[in-house]
Amino acid sequence: MPRRREVPKREILPDPKFGNVELSKFMNVIMESGKKAVAERIIYGALELIEKKHPDKDPLEAFTVAINNVKPMVEVKSRRVGGANYQVPVEVRPVRRLALSMRWIKEAARKRGEKSMAQRLANELLEATEGRGGAMKKRDEVHRMAEANKAFSHFRF
């Protein structure tokens, strides 16, 4: 992997319905095999379901709150020191924070039991806004690992 220069970040256009860049990124996370129309249908369907279940809540705000709640602050990275592997807690960069939270929400939604992906996603997002659900469990697990390995934080990268 060449280390010559930093690759410029590609600018992602906001989604057509809400004009939100984060929603557009989430669409790309949900998308499989280049089927953006399917991903779009799933996400907009989930946001409509959120609006139906909670007419008082703005679905876009619920989405943003869910993403922010799931974002991890610290994670562990393996570091080899003197023949032993240590799990060293490190702070998560903001871009990775967003990517991880979106990925965890997607994975948690996939594991749910509801019929359609839109329903699964809507329920996962609603649970994440309330601080529970599979994605929140994953974040708490990562935080617990970092807390348990706090003693190795002096091995920072």
Curated annotation (Swiss-Prot):
One of its GO terms (cellular component) is small ribosomal subunit. GO terms for molecular function: rRNA binding; structural constituent of ribosome; tRNA binding. CDD domains: uS7_Bacteria (cd14869). Pfam families: Ribosomal_S7. HAMAP family: Ribosomal_uS7_B. InterPro entries: Ribosomal_uS7, Ribosomal_uS7_bac/org-type, Ribosomal_uS7_CS, Ribosomal_uS7_dom, Ribosomal_uS7_dom_sf. One of the primary rRNA binding proteins, it binds directly to 16S rRNA where it nucleates assembly of the head domain of the 30S subunit. Is located at the subunit interface close to the decoding center, probably blocks exit of the E-site tRNA. Part of the 30S ribosomal subunit. Contacts proteins S9 and S11. Belongs to the universal ribosomal protein uS7 family. Keywords: Ribonucleoprotein, Ribosomal protein, RNA-binding, rRNA-binding, tRNA-binding. Disulfide bonds: none annotated. This is Small ribosomal subunit protein uS7. GO terms for biological process: translation. It comes from Verminephrobacter eiseniae (strain EF01-2).
